[in-house]
Amino acid sequence: IKSSAASDVYKRQLYIRMKTLMEETLNNQADWVLFESYFNSTHQNFMDRLRQRYSDLTTGDLRICCLLRMNLSTKEIASLMNVSVRAIELRRYRLRKRLELEGDTNLVDFLMNF
């Protein structure tokens, strides 16, 4: 039980670090590499698995996937990425196409369970 509690604390600390990195900047490539490392360690290599299964995803697609997996809203993502809400809506639409999701499949649910 102690191990589980320690693991939860560790995951929480990593989450806080990731959020701090995102708030500072996600546009700097070095920061993105660090974010990716933290994200993969807390989400069972999510990005690696996603990249392996869907090799045509762009870096921007992967960023959106990570932010959606963190359960951020479209508005929050737009604010973090310094773009309009409409731009994120369009990226989500294109991402659904690249992931070949059915019309009734929720993008966030898909990413949470991936």
Residue ranges and their predicted role:
Residues 15-16:
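Coiled-coil dimerization/phosphotransfer module
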